[in-house]
Amino acid sequence: LIPIASLTGQPVTFTGRGRLMERPQSVYETLYREQNLRFEQSPAGLTVEGALTPGDYRLAGNVSSQFISGLLFALPLLPGDSTLHLIPPVESRSYIDMTRAVQAAFGVHSRWLDATTLLLPGGQQYRPCDYNVEGDYSQAAFPAVLGAVCGGVTITGLAPDTLQGDAAILDILRRCGAVFTRKGDSVTFAKA
């Protein structure tokens, strides 16, 4: 949300409870300082001010994909093209590609120029559409392990053609001896 808020050019303050405001934001802080934008984080909140501009952005490829996704959502809305250079290693490629797939469904496109550089054409707009959010393989891992041990568990909403890296849990469980069948987006475990 931070880069999206920076499309307004206005001061925006994010607040939260508990430890939420203690989460490290150094990735964005560095980026904002390079852009001469205001970025102030305190226990009371996080304030950003100033507008992102089209151009070249550099970000470590081994940071949380959430930082990369934030820029992917915002940069195509700027009036000019931007490039996002990810400094290797790029550790969350599947999550970056998931973000790009969702964007494409809503009419916003980007493309890989090479293994670490994305081109984000500017001047795009998100268009409304009907979209089915697929199940989360990471969250499904817990009941999947239960099913592998006890059997009698069916998990629905797990797209077989997903880009989620955590879908590997099914292969891991199969190699450990789990017995399951897949029918569409459902996975049913039998006791091994």
Residue ranges of each PLM-predicted region?
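Short, structured segments at the rim of ligand-binding sites
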Residues: 2-192
